[in-house]
Amino acid sequence: FFQSTKGYGVFWDNYSPTLFTDNEVETSFRSEVGDCVDYYFMYGKNADGVIAQVRNLTGQAPMFPLWTYGYWQSKERYKSQEEVVDVVRKYRELGIPLDGIIQDWQYWGHNYLWNAMDFQNPTFNNPQKMMEDVHAMNAHMAISIWSSFGPMTKPYRELDKKGMLFNFTTWPQSGLESWPPNMEYPSGVRVYDAYNPEARDIYWKYLNDGIFKLGMDAWWMDSTEPD
């Protein structure tokens, strides 16, 4: 597909290897194999008109909420709910536009509680208030969630009883927060079987009860291809 500043676009619908040429002399497509030339020409008068025709061809794509296109603040992680709220408050004091803040890992506590889907770190002792404070300043929050669980978490125990955990080593390797990993204390973290519908229901149950119901606005789905 290419789109011209002259208000039209061309979608070249061919599944073989295709060469696209665009220079001062010509704009062209050339495919190695094909029973016929198959393409869609879309004239929309302007860029928006062309994109509208593409959407009619491929199907309507829902837009994310407007706030997701604004400025986001993040770092390796915030170590307490007070730090999260203070960062948002500082942006407001400075008059710098901010739409979202991202909380990365370890809000659940130590590695044996990996991805507990619950704020078990004592520095996040009132996550409901944290969410209310962030929202009161007209900001939003996203949080890191994983496809794996530590052996001391409720999701792990329920999934393990039902045989819904994969049996391979994943990150973090050690239960201790040291580097390099101390393998005398393996973390026991395991990835759940997302191909199993019942396992997905269990995953959502804990995610909903522990985080979403607090008013969390977005997920950062970390390690979707397990380390």
Locate the predicted segments by residue.
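Catalytic-domain carbohydrate-binding cleft regions of carbohydrate-active enzymes
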Residues: F1-D227
